[in-house]
Amino acid sequence: MSEAYVETIGGETVLRRTPASDHERLVESLHALVRAALPFNSTLQLLPPRSPLRLADDCVLCPDLAVVRANPEGVSSPHLVAEVLLPGDHHLDTFIKKQIWSDLRLPRLWMVDPRYLNIEVYGCNEFGFTLQDILANHHPLTDPHLPGLSCSMEEFFKPVRRG
């Protein structure tokens, strides 16, 4: 079981509560899917769950999943971030952090919502984030930079589905 963790937003410390076991199962599944789909010689690197990403002096975020692109200068830039929403604690992820990622021109954001058994896929353009898809039921989770990634929402949410 994971522990509570801290993020810094606008210089303010934000204590995030301990994720539930269903949340952690989804995070583990995401990591396994992405790890298996990353090309062998890719410049993309999957970080451990909730690795702190210092985005500015006053901003450190700890996404559930982060894939960074390494560049020759040794600086890594976020390429894909996924947040698994916690019931009762999703405002920070769905509004505040999503705006931060949009302002930083993050190429891809996945918002995983276990309440509705779907994933919202955002991409960035010149105006910020655009909702590109809402994946549910038999729709597969795919990504152009992860050629081997394909998992239906039905299969992905199976470990937490009730009934």
What are the residue ranges of the model-derived segments?
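Gly/Pro/Ser/Thr-rich low-complexity, intrinsically disordered segments predominantly at protein N-termini
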Residues: 1-163
